[in-house]
């Protein structure tokens, strides 16, 4: 291999020499080299590195070094002088010290410098004059123009290199572009093989030992060798030995049997593969010759160090080939190995290293903001402006001006409809209640706290080793000391309290606890395996099934009743430095289940039971007392029955002695028989029958037998009566409620009262017992009833309060609206502020509507009046014809006054500065004198379209406004009544109040302040820029008779076509129709990359935008049949196709110069950005494409559009006869070869484009193939399709970072943590099931979709690419379009009423015949004033720039704007200064606009990069160029 060349301080050294320097000892090196490294980088602050190069390019253009240097003819001190140039100058002065040199005076130096510049300027001016004179003499214009050379790589000169690879355009390219003919590829390869092998012979001979041995034995005559005609040893004649024929030439002719070295023709002709090779012992000539043969390259100064960052060093496959310590500071990250595959049986590839195990690692990035930005270690950091960081850990710094991209509203209010006209339902965007929101907020705060603690441990020196050792010690102490001690103490305590110990249960749970070693991020490894470099990277210890000491173990039945959520939370934890447990790493310590709490709880219950034992005894005593009383009651009853029986016996004896009273009593008893119950009557009758029977038997029996029989009969009767009374006791009590009458009392009345008292006591006793038994249930139901009633009352009262609040709010709103309606009748003419001014204009509109329409059917739609600027009011005034206010619309469309307005309204509008006219005034006042008005009109921030103000209001109201935006004719079905409008306004006022009362957004405030500061700064310098074409127009004036088709989107047009329709007077950012391709140029706009007029929308097909801006600008009464063909011709064209402009007749077409803002480029890539959706999310991909690949504007000849009409596509009908002469003239010049071929081949340009794209791809592939950065791989690896696809995505960025979606990222990381543990376990079943139950391992993430692609992941939002885009270096075309961009948009394309139309400015062959004073000829044709012939364009851009620079040296001494008239072709034309003050409506008058543009081109050019001294800013990224005041060069004078 040839040694690598490295250029250091102007010297060329090789890698071999560098290695020799490294072999030197430290004492052998000079003292200066030890103290100061002369190869070390100074500045730039960036390490310019690319994958295509091994070492980075040394950029020494921006460094502080003070030295004197000549500038503008004088010697000044430069603080950025190149140090190498200073060193060379000192060396030259030392060599020339022997000679005496005379130093000239400073005046002579300055005079020489001025003389040289004048001479150069005169030469350029004379050359320009000569070219112009040649044109006047009738020379061919294409020969007069100065041409630029393009490098072509095709014989037909049809295919040129792209601009970036063309050395004539972009300078020498660092890469190589080679193209080998396929026919001669084999011969070329064989020849190169020959040459390489022969080149290697001297190098091999030099270091060969065999050569040294044979050198002493073999000698032969050199002359004989030199006379041999077939001598092949001429290249090694220096060594005059014979060894080449016997030793090294064998290696050359190894494959001579398969293929001859050269053909027979070559042998006959005596040709040799190599003609001559000069002898050089240092191989320098051989190497140079080899470089000339293989390729052409340019040696660039490179750093001798091959710097790498930390991640590159960690990802090196071969640590032995490491280049040393990393020298570039990358984002703080660590490589964490999560799995090491040590199973060697799996590998079947013999090329793999069996000793090296395969590792799977993750990159752990720090959560801090990355402000290192690839800085070189030891270099100075750049001083930049302060950046605001809103979040605690923010990846990239965002300027506050662009914070609208990051707006994320977490909470919003919405009003819903009133139910029954009284109730309002408040709905929030998130349906979570207050508790859930608090939980989410707490979770976020905990996460931020954990991140802060983790970063603190990372930032402190030697913190990770200390923490790791403490964690390991805490794990050992906990597992083997603390927990066993607690178990022993617990069981001894149980033994002392006469309880059974629980040794087995406790030690079983202790053995179940596992201490898993984890990485710093929490990735689980195993119990015994420590993470790699855990002392420096950090470690976590995760405890699975943590042991918690319990006072006793419950049975299995009671353990099943435990809440599963609590068990789930206790399954794992992390160990802290203090030996405590936490849920998450670096989280707060959690509370362990207390040991003594259950014991104290049981003791409390026991104490409560002892304290309440007395009430229990009383309760038991009461029960015993009641039982005794019951027994006593039954005894008394028995005694009473016994006494009754004795009394009956006594009565029986008494009746037997005195029978008469018995009969009397019987009669009395029988007399009352009808009044007794049936039971008593039966009983008495039964007794009487027995007595009768007994009196009969007394006669036959003796007295003793009679007595015995009577007693037994009486006993049986009493027994039966007792039983009957016991059964029918309740019934007897109910019947005996009747009070006996006087004289009817008997013996049974007393018994009846006694029985009733006894029943009442029994009832009371039973009910009291029932009450005691059911008292707890009764108390519980009572409490529930009270609680329910209280809750219902509270809810109803809250509802009443809400109704009262809503009613009061409604009344206040109605009162406020009533006051507004009342205030509309009065106009305050003395004190008017901005809000009153806007409301007064609104009232004036409604008054005008009432005057001319006499109805409220077409009343104005109310909108947010307090958030609109004056510029918006101006715009609405100019568009009032949409609301059928024709009188006001006509006033604004042409110069003149209206007699239909009242004097009061006119005077008021004039007093506010909008219109200053009187009743008899015929012309509007020139608005150019009001600087602030022009300033507002010239900036898009204050030129609000309808889309901007509609964003202020909520979505529902905006939808209604958009639907009702188009107002139909009077009496249309779409018109709405005034009452409905009033209701909508009330509804919106309520929404507005709630929106204003919500929390203000911090980002919005910051963005507003920054925008105000920027606008104020620009307005302060407005006087210096007031002559700029940005403010040279008024958006109020429209030619009379021209309609503004404001509702043009309602016509049947394609969406992409309706977007590009621009009315005559409204700017393109004023007229954004809500369609498919609508975007907002104010809200989301990046001023570093994006200009308001240059937007690459990324269409999938070519769309001629400028062409559509001219369509349908004629009145709608014209023939519209040709509109369907307006866009057919555009789809088949490529980036470089010539522009087509549709006329009334499609065959009449002509080409113009400008590719309007470069938007006809085909979209090559789809959107892959993660920027949040804008107001119109359809245009996010277009914005991304612009930033990925900015506008490419092709360079064309400036006079290409002057050569007539061309036929671009076969779809257009062209009149061949009329253009026969023109097409024949085209063939004479090589510029138009492609145009003629395009007529023959319809798809030719498509082939060109595909070839250009393939060439660029081949260039990139070639560069990557030739890169030396690819290292040899030790394993047989190959990229799969996904890696290739990912590489193709990332090639478009220089810096980028990939990340998953947040939700998916957390799931994947959790699964990876579990996988890494399961792979190390022998029996992972239990851990896997536990992980699934805890939710750590998700089964849905484990499912892998086979057909998924990278683009699908990106579109689905799972994979996000966050590019860090660099600045763009604008070329000449960019500045040119900046100047003409607004004139292209605002050009007046009104209908010319006359039959005379404007033709092309320049004829085909004759300039003088067609160039009139204003550069146009009146012929039939449409008006197309895009470009004029400027004499300066004859020169090339480089010579043109040189001429302007030379002319600007003395421009400060002359009054440029006050010069005399400009002479061209004997015609006098006024200077351009009067145009700024005479009339501001240049784009409404074609003649004036052409004059103005004619002077705009040569007079005002933006200062280009060649004119700027880049040392002023000491920066490479152009961030400070925004503070530069652009200098405008004056025009040159042609005498």
Swiss-Prot record:
Family under the similarity heading: Belongs to the TIC214 family.
Function: Involved in protein precursor import into chloroplasts. May be part of an intermediate translocation complex acting as a protein-conducting channel at the inner envelope.
Recorded coiled-coil stretches: none
Keyword Lyase: no
One annotated GO biological process: protein transport
Primary localization class, coarse: plastid
Full protein name: Putative protein TIC 214 C-terminal part
Entry GO terms, CC: chloroplast; membrane
InterPro entries: TIC214
UniProt source species: Piper cenocladum (Ant piper)
């Amino acid at each position: 291999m040839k040694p690598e060349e490295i250029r250091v301080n102007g010297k060329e050294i090789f890698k071999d020499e560098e290695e020799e320097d490294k072999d030197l000892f430290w004492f052998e090196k000079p003292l200066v080299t030890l103290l100061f490294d002369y190869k070390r980088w100074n500045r730039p602050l960036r390490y310019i590195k690319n994958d295509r190069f091994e070492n980075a390019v040394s950029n020494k253009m921006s460094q502080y070094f003070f030295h004197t240097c000549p500038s503008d003819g004088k010697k000044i001190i430069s603080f950025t002088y190149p140090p190498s140039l200073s060193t060379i100058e000192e060396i030259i002065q030392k060599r020339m010290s022997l000679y005496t040199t005379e130093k000239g005076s400073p005046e002579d130096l300055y005079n020489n410098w001025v003389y040289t510049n004048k001479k150069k300027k005169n030469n350029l001016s004379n050359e320009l004059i000569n070219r112009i004179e040649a044109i006047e003499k009738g020379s061919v214009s294409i020969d007069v123009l100065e041409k630029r050379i393009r490098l072509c790589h095709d014989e037909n000169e049809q295919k040129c290199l792209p601009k970036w690879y063309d050395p004539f355009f972009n300078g020498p390219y660092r890469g190589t572009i080679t193209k080998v003919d396929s026919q001669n590829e084999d011969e070329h390869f064989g020849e190169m093989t020959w040459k390489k092998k022969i080149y290697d012979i001297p190098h091999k001979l030099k270091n060969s030992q065999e050569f040294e041995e044979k050198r002493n034995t073999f000698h032969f005559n050199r002359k004989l060798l030199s006379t041999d005609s077939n001598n092949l040893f001429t290249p090694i004649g220096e060594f005059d030995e014979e060894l080449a024929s016997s030793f090294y030439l064998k290696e050359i002719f190894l494959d001579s049997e398969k293929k001859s070295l050269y053909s027979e023709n070559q042998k006959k002709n005596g040709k040799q593969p190599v003609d001559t090779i000069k002898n050089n012992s240092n191989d320098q000539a051989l190497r140079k010759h080899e470089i000339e043969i293989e390729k052409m390259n340019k040696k660039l100064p490179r750093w001798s160090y091959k710097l790498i960052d930390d991640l590159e060093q960690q990802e090196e496959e071969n640590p032995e080939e490491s280049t040393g310590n990393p020298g570039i500071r990358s984002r703080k990250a660590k490589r964490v190995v999560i799995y090491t595959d040590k199973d060697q049986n799996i590998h079947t590839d013999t090329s793999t290293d069996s000793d090296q195990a395969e590792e799977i690692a993750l990159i752990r990035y720090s959560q801090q903001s990355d402000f290192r930005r690839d800085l070189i270690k030891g270099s100075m950091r750049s001083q930049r402006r302060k950046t605001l960081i809103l979040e605690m850990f923010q990846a990239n710094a965002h300027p506050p001006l662009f914070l609208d991209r990051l707006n994320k509203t977490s909470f919003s209010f919405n009003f819903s409809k009133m139910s029954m006209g009284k109730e309002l339902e408040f709905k929030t965007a998130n349906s979570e209640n207050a508790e859930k929101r608090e939980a989410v907020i707490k979770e976020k705060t905990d996460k931020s706290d954990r991140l802060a603690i983790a970063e603190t441990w990372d930032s402190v020196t030697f913190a990770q080793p200390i923490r790791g050792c403490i964690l390991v010690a805490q794990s050992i102490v906990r597992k083997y000391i603390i927990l066993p001690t607690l178990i022993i103490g617990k069981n001894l305590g149980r033994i002392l309290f006469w309880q059974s110990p629980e040794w087995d249960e406790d030690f079983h749970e202790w053995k179940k606890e596992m201490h898993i070693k984890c990485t710093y991020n929490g990735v689980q490894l195993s119990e015994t395996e420590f993470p790699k470099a855990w002392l420096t990277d950090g470690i976590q210890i995760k405890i699975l099934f943590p042991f918690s000491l319990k006072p006793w173990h419950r049975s299995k039945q009671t353990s099943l009743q435990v809440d599963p959520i609590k068990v789930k939370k206790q399954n794992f934890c992390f160990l802290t430095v203090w030996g405590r447990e936490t849920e998450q790493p670096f989280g707060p310590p959690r509370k362990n289940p207390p040991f003594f709490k259950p014991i104290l709880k049981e003791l409390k219950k026991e104490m409560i039971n002892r304290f309440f034992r007395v009430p229990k005894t009383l309760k038991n005593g009461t029960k015993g007392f009641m039982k005794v009383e019951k027994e006593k009651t039954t005894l008394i009853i028995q005694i009473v029955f016994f006494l009754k029986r004795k009394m009956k016996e006594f009565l029986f004896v008494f009746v037997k002695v005195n029978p008469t009273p018995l009969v009397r009593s019987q009669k009395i008893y029988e007399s009352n028989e009808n009044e007794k119950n049936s039971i008593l009557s039966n009983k008495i009758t039964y007794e009487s029958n027995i007595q009768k029977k007994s009196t009969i038997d007394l006669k036959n029996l003796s007295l003793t037998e009679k007595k015995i029989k009577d007693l037994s009969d009486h006993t049986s009767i009493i027994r039966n009566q007792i039983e009957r009374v016991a059964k029918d006791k309740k019934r007897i009590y109910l019947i005996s409620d009747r009070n006996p009458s006087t004289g009817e009392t008997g013996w049974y009345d007393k018994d009846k009262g006694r029985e009733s008292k006894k029943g009442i006591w029994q009832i009371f006793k039973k009910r009291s017992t029932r009450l005691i038994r059911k008292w707890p249930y009764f108390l519980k139901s009572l409490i529930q009833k009270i609680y329910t009633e209280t809750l219902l009352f509270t809810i109803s009262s809250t509802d009443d309060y809400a109704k009262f609040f809503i009613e009061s709010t409604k009344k206040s709103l109605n009162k406020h609206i009533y006051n507004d309606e009342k205030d509309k009748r009065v106009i305050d003419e003395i004190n008017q502020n901005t809000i009153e001014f806007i409301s007064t204009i609104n009232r004036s509109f409604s008054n005008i509507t009432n005057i001319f329409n006499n109805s409220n059917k077409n009343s104005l739609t109310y909108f947010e009046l307090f958030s609109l600027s004056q510029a918006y009011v101006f715009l609405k005034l100019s568009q009032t014809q949409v609301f059928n206010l024709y009188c006001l619309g006509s006033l604004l469309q042409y110069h003149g006054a209206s007699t239909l307005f009242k004097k009061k309204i006119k005077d008021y509008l004039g007093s506010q500065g909008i219109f200053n006219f009187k009743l008899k005034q015929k012309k509007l006042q020139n608005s150019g004198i009001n600087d602030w008005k022009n300033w507002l009109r010239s900036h898009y921030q204050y030129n609000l379209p309808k889309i901007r103000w509609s964003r202020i209001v909520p979505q529902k109201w905006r939808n209604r406004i958009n639907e009702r935006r188009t107002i139909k004719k009077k009496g249309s079905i779409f018109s709405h009544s005034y009452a409905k409008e009033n209701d909508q306004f009330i509804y919106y006022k309520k929404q507005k109040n709630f929106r204003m009362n919500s929390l203000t957004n911090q980002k919005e405030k910051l963005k507003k302040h920054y925008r105000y500061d920027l606008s104020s700064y620009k307005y302060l310098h407005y006087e210096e820029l007031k002559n700029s074409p940005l403010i040279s127009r008024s958006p109020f004036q429209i030619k009379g008779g021209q309609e503004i088709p404001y509702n043009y989107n309602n016509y049947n047009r394609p969406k992409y076509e309706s977007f590009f329709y621009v009315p005559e007077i409204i700017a393109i950012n004023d007229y954004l129709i809500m369609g498919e391709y609508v975007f907002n140029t104010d809200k989301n706009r990046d001023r570093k990359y994006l200009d308001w007029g240059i937007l690459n929308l990324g269409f999938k097909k070519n769309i001629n935008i400028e062409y559509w801006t001219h369509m349908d600008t004629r009145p709608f009464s014209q023939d519209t049949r040709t509109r369907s063909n307006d866009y057919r011709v555009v789809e088949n064209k490529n980036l470089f196709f010539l522009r087509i402009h549709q006329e009334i007749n499609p065959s009449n077409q002509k080409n113009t110069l400008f590719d309007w803002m470069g938007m006809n480029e085909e979209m090559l890539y789809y959107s892959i950005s993660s920027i949040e959706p804008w107001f119109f999310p359809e245009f996010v991909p277009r914005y991304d494409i612009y930033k990925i690949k900015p506008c490419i504007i092709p360079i064309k000849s400036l006079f290409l559009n002057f050569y007539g009409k061309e036929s671009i596509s076969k779809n257009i009908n062209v009149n061949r006869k009329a253009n026969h002469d023109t097409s024949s003239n085209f063939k004479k010049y090589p510029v138009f070869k492609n145009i003629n071929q395009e007529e023959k081949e319809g798809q030719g340009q498509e082939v060109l484009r595909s070839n250009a794209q393939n060439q660029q791809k081949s260039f990139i592939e070639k560069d990557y193939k030739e890169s030396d950065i690819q290292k040899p791989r030790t394993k047989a690896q190959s990229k799969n399709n996904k890696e290739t696809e990912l590489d193709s995505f990332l090639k478009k960025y220089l810096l980028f970072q990939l990340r998953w979606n947040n939700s998916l990222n957390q799931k994947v990381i959790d699964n990876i943590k579990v996988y890494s543990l399961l792979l190390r376990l022998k029996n992972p079943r239990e851990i896997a099931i536990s992980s699934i139950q805890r939710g750590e391992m998700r089964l849905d993430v484990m499912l892998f979709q086979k057909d998924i692609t990278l683009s699908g992941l990106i579109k689905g939002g799972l994979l996000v690419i966050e590019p860090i885009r660099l600045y763009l270096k604008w070329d000449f075309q960019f500045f040119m379009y900046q100047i003409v961009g607004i004139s292209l948009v605002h050009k007046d394309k009104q209908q010319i009423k006359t039959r005379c139309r404007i033709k092309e400015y320049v004829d085909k062959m004759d300039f003088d015949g067609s160039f009139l004073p204003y550069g146009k000829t009146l012929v039939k044709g449409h008006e197309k004033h895009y470009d004029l012939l400027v004499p300066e364009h004859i020169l090339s851009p480089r010579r043109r720039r040189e001429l302007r620079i030379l002319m600007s040296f003395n421009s400060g001494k002359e009054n440029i704007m006050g010069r005399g008239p400009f002479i061209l072709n004997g015609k006098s034309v006024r200077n351009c200064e009067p145009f700024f003050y005479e009339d501001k409506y240049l784009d409404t008058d074609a003649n004036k606009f052409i004059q103005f543009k004619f002077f705009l081109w040569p007079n005002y050019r933006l200062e280009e990069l060649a004119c700027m001294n880049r040392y002023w800013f000491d920066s490479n990224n152009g961030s400070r160029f925004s503070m530069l005041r652009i200098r405008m060069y004056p025009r040159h004078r042609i005498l």
